[in-house]
Amino acid sequence: MPGLTLGDVVPDLELDTTHGKIRLHDFVGDAYAIIFSHPADFTPVCTTELSEMAGYAGEFDKRGVKLLGFSCDDVESHKDWIKDIEAYKPGRRVGFPIVADPDREAIRQLNMIDADEKDTAGGELPNRALHIVGPDKKVKLSFLFPACTGRNMAEVLRATDALLTAARHRVATPVNWKPGERVVIPPGVSDEEAKARFPAGFETAQLPSNKCYLRFTQVD
């Protein structure tokens, strides 16, 4: 499944991890899960990223969101590297599993291959891919970064909150949205349905087109 993208079901892979063997669908279960790759252990950007993800792990746990890392290094390498990650920012613990994928099969199927990066033996390396997977095992959101650019974990958390809010309330979130701010009502929802679904009411933006498509409301 090299073209894995939004709406696709992730393959039910059997994976070797720092927490033992898992099946991907069993790991996701009835929750949301963030599966994310890094190019290699014992590298600078990856160390800062994994440290930051460890720092945010408690926030994801509060939301019932699971974390699963991926790279092509073996389990023992991951375990040794985790000591460096935890020493880099003392107090942060890497409590989530990291997949060992030395044959590159998992990262190929999950669309995590970086075409421009190779290891010293010429082997494929992962890019900085991140998929948010829903309880239905479908990809809900993806980020894709090159090896030279670290991800913003605050944005990953914000995007996760937006997805959870949209799923819970059947709304959409506008630009730069943060939890607690107003959301928008999707165009397919009539005003009559909106009144029933949002008893606190909604506000329609007055625009030159006189089209009433930009409607804001507040949800918990």
From Swiss-Prot:
CDD domains recorded: PRX_1cys
InterPro entries reported in the protein's UniProt record: AhpC/TSA, Peroxiredoxin_AhpC-typ, Peroxiredoxin_C, PRX_1cys, Thioredoxin-like_sf, Thioredoxin_domain
Keyword tags: Antioxidant, Cytoplasm, Nucleus, Oxidoreductase, Peroxidase, Redox-active center
Principal subcellular localisation of the protein: nucleus
Sequence similarity: Belongs to the peroxiredoxin family. Prx6 subfamily.
Thioredoxin domain mapped to chain residues: 4-165
A single BP term in Gene Ontology: cell redox homeostasis
GO annotations of cellular component type: cytosol; mitochondrion; nucleus
Catalytic residues (UniProt): C46 (cysteine sulfenic acid (-soh) intermediate)
Enzyme class: oxidoreductase
UniProt cross-references to PROSITE patterns, sorted A to Z: THIOREDOXIN_2
Position of sequence motif Bipartite nuclear localization signal: 195-218
Listed name of the protein: 1-Cys peroxiredoxin B
Molecular-function GO term, any one: thioredoxin-dependent peroxiredoxin activity
Compartment list: Nucleus; Cytoplasm
Pfam families xrefs: 1-cysPrx_C, AhpC-TSA
Keyword Nucleus set for record: yes
Miscellaneous note of the record: The active site is a conserved redox-active cysteine residue, the peroxidatic cysteine (C(P)), which makes the nucleophilic attack on the peroxide substrate. The peroxide oxidizes the C(P)-SH to cysteine sulfenic acid (C(P)-SOH), which then reacts with another cysteine residue, the resolving cysteine (C(R)), to form a disulfide bridge. The disulfide is subsequently reduced by an appropriate electron donor to complete the catalytic cycle. In this 1-Cys peroxiredoxin, no C(R) is present and C(P) instead forms a disulfide with a cysteine from another protein or with a small thiol molecule.
Catalyses which reaction(s): a hydroperoxide + [thioredoxin]-dithiol = an alcohol + [thioredoxin]-disulfide + H2O
The protein's Enzyme Commission number: 1.11.1.24
Organism: Oryza sativa subsp. indica
Job of this protein: Thiol-specific peroxidase that catalyzes the reduction of hydrogen peroxide and organic hydroperoxides to water and alcohols, respectively. Seems to contribute to the inhibition of germination during stress.
